[in-house]
Amino acid sequence: ILVDTNIIIDALANREPYADDAKRIMEKCAAREITGILAAHSIPNLFYILRKNFSQEERRFLLKNLCEIFQISDLNEKKIVAALENNAFSDFEDGLQEECAVEAMADYIVTRNPADFKHSRVKVILPDELLRELEKN
């Protein structure tokens, strides 16, 4: 499951009303109940975005832990060019997320912004929907 950057922000920055579901997803990844994937470019984005919530030292610690919890889908020329050529995504970063999900053979992209991924080749799911789906299995 490729986890969109906004889910990680929700969990780490404790953004309500989204934090609980985001934390549960991260816990399932940490417990290896599901395979969580982060796109490599999410790491520097998180480092920058979380500067309002955490010191540099805290961010380094948190992001290092994320690298232990999640598989990191690397960013390479092939993915960058494919995302640039994919006009289905108006947001280049979302196109990169989708390319990482495709190459990692992810079953889902979990995000709070499914409209951003309406043309995704990978099924897109909201956090609460993912948690309900996991409870069924």
Language-model segments: what does each one mean?
Residues 1, 35, 72, 109, ...:
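A residue-level structural signature of the nucleotidyltransferase/glycosyltransferase Rossmann-like core
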Residues 1-37, 51-61, 119, 131-137:
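Short, well-structured N-terminal submotif of metal-dependent ribonuclease cores
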Residues 3, 68, 104:
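Structured loop/turn residues at beta-strand edges in well-structured enzyme cores
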Residues 4-5, 39, 113, 127:
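A secondary-structure boundary/capping signal
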Residues 7, 42, 79, 97, ...:
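Alpha-helix capping/helix-boundary segments
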Residues 23-90, 95, 99:
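PIN-domain endoribonuclease scaffold, especially VapC-family toxins
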Residues 102-137:
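Acidic, PIN/NYN-like endoribonuclease modules and their adjacent C-terminal/linker elements
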